[in-house]
């Protein structure tokens, strides 16, 4: 059965997967299987007398049901705030129905892809509901993509229409021009302009109006939305395995891959993330995580499940973070380590004490002791998460235990640095030898590859069957991350497989070296990669961004500091000062740094 399920699931990763999914897939409604991936009912349903599967006891899971419920239960409660723009949950529901209707009226049919290029503005929030409500697949795109990469992703996703924010119209047109040149037979993509709101305080009005007047577009967002019908009948998924979104990986290694999410996975991960974030009803969530990144860690849907309020931000800045926390009584937020760094390094005189405690989720790298201490001092409670685009964002959580509160800061930091245990949406999380698939000892020392299994693992890579097969070898999803496991079941990431530095036959964890570098008082950010060496094979090369006021520091001082805190073979032999390239989600683009280190050659 496992082989049959896998074989059938792979059928969707055809260049025309939308059509295959709907017509020939055994998961489609024509098989009458609903949420079951086989054509027949489960064995127990056939052998136990009196059981019957019907609409009375089964319907495909989908996060769009959260909005339907909130429109009734939380009808008049505020769903979204953007400047002085406020919507209730009923208004959001009505707007999403109209937008879904308008998309259908444009001739975009079930299974087609709708692309979106926008920051955390109301339209981006509404598209997460309206697109699947029309039976379509949302493809949120990284707002920091260049026209060349954007054109590749638009072609690969086979998007039929592109929603684009007014500030990104120039980039979108550049991508469409490249797309037209590369494929003469391709029909022109319809372009929907998300216009500037009068209440968009973070927007540059002059440049925005210039872009809108200089570049053409087919429809304007609000005008298109108003053309729709608020009585539109939602096009529910025929099967909960139907795709709800395609999320492209952040491009930290090479060209992004399209990760397919299902309605089922999005539903389960939304609830799991709500649980691990300890969200009770009526949370107030500040959007510092990009909605285009793993659908905002699935909290675009999760906040709706709890009838919460979304505080949208076009741009993330410490000033806007503190302002909105105080103004809207924010309870939860999230962000990469760069966001935490931004907060604690904000001009001290401008810090306003938080009026209440704020829960903040972070992932990407463990919080450093000095960052954690400062965040707690300011009134934030930091939770450490870990996951990948392929696991719908957060897949693990460093679940905090009350008995740890009395420990020293150093001990608490060590515990909080661990990536923790799987959340409730996953069946399994393990650290295994990727060659033997044996679980490594839980001694906190033996390294293996982190592997996931469960309902919140991606359906696969869009139109890349070989990559999907490789990722699922041995019936586990291979993360590519190296970790150790502790006796209590918590895991701790040590490095990416490809980032391990082998010097003189010794394995060096780049993460360990980065932690020491970042503990230096002058260092704001650091990333470590391998530099070729004729004698040792490779040596650590540190790329360092200094804090303001430390411009006179020398590389030798940083190297000496590392030698004082690490075995000498692990200390960087090279230090390069400057900005560190990152994706828009805050992940370091180490492939660019490796290229620089390779160009340096041997010491």
Swiss-Prot record:
InterPro entries (UniProt xref): AMP-bd_C, AMP-bd_C_sf, AMP-binding_CS, AMP-dep_synth/lig_dom, ANL_N_sf
Keyword Lipid biosynthesis carried by entry: no
Tissue: Expressed at low levels in leaves, flowers and developing seeds.
Pfam families documented for this protein: AMP-binding, AMP-binding_C
UniProt-listed GO biological process terms: fatty acid metabolic process
The keyword ATP-binding is assigned to this record: no
Record-annotated membrane-spanning stretches: none
SUPFAM superfamilies, per database record: Acetyl-CoA synthetase-like (SSF56801)
Top-level taxon of the source organism: Eukaryota
A molecular function GO annotation: ligase activity
Known EC number: 6.2.1.-
UniProt keyword annotations, A-Z: Fatty acid metabolism, Ligase, Lipid metabolism
Reactions this protein catalyses: 3-methylbutanoate + ATP + CoA = 3-methylbutanoyl-CoA + AMP + diphosphate; hexanoate + ATP + CoA = hexanoyl-CoA + AMP + diphosphate; butanoate + ATP + CoA = butanoyl-CoA + AMP + diphosphate; pentanoate + ATP + CoA = pentanoyl-CoA + AMP + diphosphate
Family assignment from sequence similarity: Belongs to the ATP-dependent AMP-binding enzyme family.
Xref: PANTHER family: ACYL-ACTIVATING ENZYME, ISOVALERATE--COA LIGASE AAE2
NCBIfam families: PRK08162.1 (NF006020)
Protein name from the UniProt record: Isovalerate--CoA ligase AAE2
Protein's organism: Arabidopsis thaliana
């Amino acid at each position: 059965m496992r082989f049959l399920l896998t074989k059938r699931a792979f059928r969707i990763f055809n260049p025309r997967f939308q059509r295959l999914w709907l017509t020939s897939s055994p998961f489609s409604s024509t098989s009458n299987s609903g949420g079951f991936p086989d054509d027949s009912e489960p064995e127990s349903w056939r052998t136990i007398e009196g059981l019957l599967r019907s609409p009375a006891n089964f319907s495909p899971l989908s996060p769009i049901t959260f909005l339907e419920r909130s429109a009734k239960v939380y009808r008049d409660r505020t769903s979204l705030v953007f400047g002085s723009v406020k919507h209730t949950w009923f208004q959001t529901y009505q707007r999403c129905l109209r937008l879904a209707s308008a998309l259908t009226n444009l001739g975009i049919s079930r299974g087609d892809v709708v692309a979106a290029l926008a920051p955390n503005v109301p339209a981006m929030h509404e598209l997460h509901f309206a697109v699947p409500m029309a039976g379509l697949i949302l493809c949120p795109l990284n707002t920091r993509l260049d026209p060349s990469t954007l054109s590749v992703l638009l072609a690969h996703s086979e998007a039929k229409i592109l929603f684009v924010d007014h500030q990104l119209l120039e980039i979108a047109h550049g991508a469409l021009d490249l797309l037209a040149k590369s494929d003469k037979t391709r029909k022109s993509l319809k372009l929907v302009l998300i216009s500037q709101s009068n209440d968009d305080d973070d927007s540059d009005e002059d440049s925005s109006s210039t872009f809108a007047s200089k570049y053409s577009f087919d429809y304007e967002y609000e005008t298109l939305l108003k053309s729709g019908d608020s009585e539109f009948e939602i096009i529910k998924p025929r099967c909960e395995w139907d795709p709800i979104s395609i999320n492209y990986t952040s491009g930290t290694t090479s060209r992004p891959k399209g990760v397919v999410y299902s309605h089922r996975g999005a539903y389960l991960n939304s609830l799991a993330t709500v649980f691990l974030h300890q969200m009770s009803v009526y949370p107030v969530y500040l959007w510092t995580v990009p909605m285009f990144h793993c659908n905002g860690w699935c909290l675009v849907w999760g906040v709706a499940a709890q009838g919460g309020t979304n505080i949208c931000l076009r741009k993330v800045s410490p000033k806007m973070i503190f302002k909105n926390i105080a103004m809207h009584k924010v309870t939860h937020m999230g962000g990469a380590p760069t966001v935490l760094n931004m907060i604690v390094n904000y001009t001290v005189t401008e810090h306003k004490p938080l009026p209440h405690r704020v829960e903040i989720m972070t992932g990407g790298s463990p919080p450093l002791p000095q960052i954690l201490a400062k965040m707690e001092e300011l009134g934030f409670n930091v939770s450490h998460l870990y996951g990948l685009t392929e696991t719908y964002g957060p897949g693990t959580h460093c679940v905090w235990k009350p008995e740890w509160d009395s420990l020293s800061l150093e001990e608490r930091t060590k515990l909080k640095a661990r990536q923790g245990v799987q959340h409730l949406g996953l069946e399994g999380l393990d650290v295994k030898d990727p060659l033997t698939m044996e679980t490594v000892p839980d001694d906190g020392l033996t390294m293996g590859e982190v592997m996931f299994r469960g309902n919140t693992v991606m359906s696969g890579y869009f139109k890349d069957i070989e990559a999907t097969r490789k990722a699922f070898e041995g019936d586990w999803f291979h993360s590519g991350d190296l970790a150790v496991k502790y006796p209590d079941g918590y895991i701790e990431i040590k490095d990416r497989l490809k980032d391990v530095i082998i010097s003189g036959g010794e394995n060096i964890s780049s993460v360990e070296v980065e932690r020491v570098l970042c503990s230096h008082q002058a260092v704001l950010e650091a990333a470590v990669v391998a530099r070729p060496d004729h004698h040792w094979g490779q040596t650590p090369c540190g790329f360092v961004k200094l804090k303001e006021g430390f411009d006179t520091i020398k590389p030798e001082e940083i190297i000496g500091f590392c030698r004082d805190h690490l075995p000498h073979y692990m200390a960087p032999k090279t230090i390069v000062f400057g900005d560190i390239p990152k994706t828009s989600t805050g992940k370091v683009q180490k492939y660019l740094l490796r290229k620089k280190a390779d160009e340096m050659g041997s010491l």
